[in-house]
Amino acid sequence: MKPAGPFTRELWTTVQPVYEQIINCLFVRRLTDGTLPRKWFTYYLSQDVLYIIDDSRALAVTAARAEKQDEMYFLLELAKDGLDIERSMHDDFIENYTIPEAPEKSPAFKAYADFLLNNAYYSPYPVAAAALLPCFWVYYKTGEYVFKNAIDNNPYRKWIDTYSGNEYIQYTKRFIQITENLGQKTNHIIRKQMENAFTKGAKHELSVFEEASKQ
């Protein structure tokens, strides 16, 4: 998944070290080689079920603040249809793995959800969008890495396939392009805030994997 222009290229360059940490963290390495403990995966998935509700809410709030109608419609579509992709995968694993419902969000997932919602409500619209982008771009890149390196008959293949599917790719490409456009037309102060939000979002992606591997 390539950047859409100079601004998103700069964003990815900034976050590249965090991405390297993600694909080399214990959770992702063991997901890739098929040795991920079931306990870690069920913990992660039970938390992710709660997280995507707030992620969807943050997308909807950000959509309401969009300056262009096409961006508003896209973010609303993403809040529903894009996350339906994840819910379908969650439902399948929950049914087959008998995953218990988490009573509340864990510290790492709560911090991530709060970060997205705070930006959605209170940051300038371009910054809110940049904060949400890692949930798709970094997640896609991580899934792409796992897909290319996963062993045959990986027990978590459905999770892996979800984030390398064409529908998820198209949503992510469009989101990157929107962020590129927003970065190109705004001032340097907002661009810096967008960069900071994107980096923090990527770090939250890392933190939820690290938390799951400590269970």
Description of each model-found segment:
Residues 1-9, 31-42, 121, 154-162, ...:
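Short, charged, low-complexity loops and linkers
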Residues 2, 70-170, 199, 203:
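Active-site-proximal alpha-helical scaffolds that flank and shape metal-associated catalytic sites
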Residues 2-9, 15, 19, 115-118, ...:
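Hydrophobic alpha-helical segments
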Residues 150-156, 180-192:
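Acidic interhelical loop/turn segments
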Residues 16-21, 35-65, 85, 130-140:
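Alpha-helical bundle segments that constitute or directly flank the non-heme di-iron/ferroxidase center
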Residues 12-36, 55, 176-185:
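Short alpha-helical hairpin
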Residues 43-54, 77, 81, 193-200, ...:
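A non-catalytic, amphipathic alpha-helix used as a structural packing/dimerization or gating element
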Residues 184-215:
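Long hydrophobic alpha-helical segments typical of transmembrane helices together
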